[in-house]
UniProtKB/Swiss-Prot annotation:
GO molecular function, one term: metal ion binding
Class of this enzyme: lyase
InterPro entries hit by this protein: Ade2_fungi/plant, ATP-grasp, ATP-grasp_carboxylate-amine, ATP_grasp_subdomain_1, PreATP-grasp_dom_sf, PurE_ClassI, PurE_dom, PurK
Name of this chain's protein: Phosphoribosylaminoimidazole carboxylase
Family label: In the C-terminal section; belongs to the AIR carboxylase family. Class I subfamily.
Domain ATP-grasp residues, every copy: 114-305
Record's keyword terms, sorted: ATP-binding, Decarboxylase, Lyase, Nucleotide-binding, Purine biosynthesis
HAMAP family, sorted: PurE_classI, PurK
Pathway: Purine metabolism; IMP biosynthesis via de novo pathway; 5-amino-1-(5-phospho-D-ribosyl)imidazole-4-carboxylate from 5-amino-1-(5-phospho-D-ribosyl)imidazole (carboxylase route): step 1/1
Catalytic activity: 5-amino-1-(5-phospho-D-ribosyl)imidazole-4-carboxylate + H(+) = 5-amino-1-(5-phospho-beta-D-ribosyl)imidazole + CO2
The species this protein was found in: Cryptococcus neoformans var. neoformans serotype D (strain B-3501A)
EC identifiers of the protein: 4.1.1.21
Gene Ontology biological-process entries: 'de novo' IMP biosynthetic process
Length: 582
């Protein structure tokens, strides 16, 4: 293998630190420019001989040029760099820069970025530029056009909510308060986006313009700081795929190679609006280290070095990331959260090696993976309740607790549906089987004839909501299982219900006689027990613990029968029959 090119990184924080891990595995020499000899990134990888990691500001022209002279490629772990110097370095042939300095400069100015994307057909919230030194009349005029409330945003040097200020009214008091918060910076205004979720997608782009996206994540903030990410994004109307397509479209209009973090809003009507892009690894992609086949950090290096891009697919069905934030100047709370995470199955701790803690500073993160959303919920709750600012109501919104008995789970794997409440006694045994195996489920009524739109919506959204199998009970014409099977990619198990006439044979024939290409499994009449067992076996193909549990269940059935054989042989069949009559 030919020697790898040397990569220089502007910035030596936690993102640079996490870039060093795949660099070491791939044999990629790194040089890191930042002030200090023991920054988070410099702690974890030695520089290639005879060099040392340069010590100095990553915005300094002198230091950037010195770094460029020792590297083949420069990249960034933070966008607040000197784009002019990077452009000059590349033009002079000192070093290649990725992503393109042109892209970095564009993204540094959030107004220019938004204007550029909007002109290329990327969906964004309405926005307008404010003049330099805006007056109160300027604010009132723009409020009249965009409506109130609106969001005032700094064009540059804004992150973690530090460049945003909501303007709730056009009063002098509110305007002056926003100006004081934002300081003397160029501003623009953005129409209010009453989103239902904040979403992010990581996109990797190579030098040829090929883009690949990771599964979308739901990003959950408190006080404008990212606290939790959940993936894959659950929702209706194929929202995960639509988010990926929007992110790929946006990054496709940029220049240069690397990883990009694309933030967006999911609106009440299902529309997605792009918020902003980061030209670097992003907090909303940290889960990819454990949860994906190739992490965002490795793919960034692959992209800028023209190596084959790695798969962005998830390794696991469900994953989350929890930021570890400083609670004070001491490390006590951080150590407590990290130690607690070591007791949570599927959790991986990443501490950033920062020497000083302060309130709300990002000191590390925890990734947690699971075989299902429900399992992830339980693990996530254990992590969140260990945080110093744990708030039960907030945690319950993110990771709902297990439901009360005989109530639907918030994160079900199996859906149990029936056409009428009269079918409930037949379908009830299925719930007991699923509970026995610890499989989260939901139960509801939807009729193929009386509520056809509800049935279609249920079927079409089932997979996006995280369901992996559907048990459908129906009597008489019994169209429900087949109609649901025609509207979903999930396995559907039909339960023929014995109606008042024909003893359920009509239901059986209706369900079992599906046309080719629309499979619908069918069990015996009124046998929801077997339907649930089949659902568990289906889940067991991807969840080893359930596969083992079904084996133990079958073994218990065998032992039960063998015990009866022993009693029959010991007592004789006459006494055995008398026993059965009691």
């Amino acid at each position: 293998m030919a020697p790898r090119k040397t990569v220089g990184i502007l910035g030596g924080g936690q993102l640079g630190r996490m870039l060093t891990h795949p660099a070491a595995l791939l044999g990629i020499p790194l040089l890191i420019l930042d002030s200090g000899s023991y920054t988070p990134a410099k702690q974890t990888l030695l520089p290639p001989p005879p060099h040392s990691h340069p010590d100095g500001p990553f915005t300094s022209e002198t230091h950037i040029r010195k770094l460029a002279s020792a590297c083949d490629i420069l990249t960034v772990e933070i966008e607040h760099v000197n784009a002019d110097v990077l452009e000059a370095v590349e033009k002079e042939g000192l070093c290649e820069v990725q992503p393109s300095p042109k892209t970095i400069r564009l993204i540094q100015n959030k107004y220019d970025q938004k204007k550029y994307l909007a002109e290329r057909g990327v969906a964004v919230a309405p926005f307008e530029e404010l003049p330099a030194n805006p007056t109160e009349e300027d604010f009132k005029a723009i409020a009249g056009r965009l409506g109130l409330p609106l969001m005032l945003k700094a064009k540059t040097l804004a992150y973690d909510g530090r460049g945003n200020s909501p303007l709730k009214s056009a009063s002098s008091e509110d305007i002056q308060a926003s100006l004081k918060f934002l300081g003397d910076r160029p501003l623009y205004a953005e129409g209010w986006a009453p989103f239902v979720k904040e979403v992010a997608v990581m996109v990797v782009r190579n030098k040829e313009g090929e883009v690949q996206s990771y599964d979308a994540v739901e990003t959950i903030h408190r006080e404008s700081i990212l606290r939790v990410c959940l993936t894959p994004l659950r929702g209706e109307k194929g929202v995960n795929q639509r988010a990926r397509e929007l992110a790929e479209k946006a990054v496709g209009h940029l220049e240069g190679a690397g990883i990009f973090g694309v933030e967006m809003f999911l609106m009440p009507d299902g529309e997605l609006l792009l918020n902003e892009i980061a030209p670097r690894p992003h907090n909303s992609g940290h889960h990819t280290i454990e949860a994906c086949l190739t992490s965002q950090f490795e793919n960034h290096l692959r992209a800028i070095l023209s190596l084959p891009l790695g798969s962005t697919a998830l390794r696991v069905p469900s994953a989350a990331m929890v930021n570890i934030l400083g609670a004070s100047s001491t490390m006590d709370a951080i150590d407590k959260m990290a130690d607690n995470a070591l007791t949570v199955p599927g959790a991986a701790v990443h501490l950033y090696g920062k020497a000083e803690s302060r309130k709300a500073r990002k000191m590390g993160h925890i990734t947690v993976t699971a075989e299902s959303d429900a399992e992830l919920n339980e693990r996530l709750r254990a992590l969140l309740f260990a945080q110093p600012d744990a708030h039960a109501d907030w945690i319950d919104l993110i990771a709902p607790p297990s439901p009360a008995p005989a109530h639907s789970h918030a994160k079900p794997l199996v859906g149990i549906i029936m056409g009428s409440d009269s079918d409930l006694p037949v379908m009830h045994p299925a719930t007991k089987i699923l509970e026995k195996f610890g499989v989260p489920y939901e139960l509801t009524i939807t009729s193929a004839h009386r509520t056809p739109e509800r049935m279609v919506k249920y079927a079409k959204t089932a997979a996006d909501r995280g369901l992996r199998a559907i048990i459908a009970g129906a009597g008489g014409a019994a169209h429900l299982p087949g109609m649901v099977a025609s509207e979903t990619s999930l396995p559907v198990i039909g339960v023929p219900v014995k109606a008042s006439v024909l003893d359920g044979v009509d239901s059986l024939y209706s369900i079992v006689q599906m046309p080719r290409g629309i499979p619908c499994a069918t069990v015996g009449i009124n046998n929801s027990t077997n339907a649930a067992l089949l659902a568990v076996r289906i889940l067991g193909t991807s969840v080893p613990a359930l596969n083992k549990a079904t084996e133990e269940y079958s073994k218990a059935l065998e032992e039960e029968v063998l015990a009866k054989v022993d009693i029959l042989e010991e007592e004789g069949w006459d006494k055995y029959i008398e026993r059965l009559k009691k």
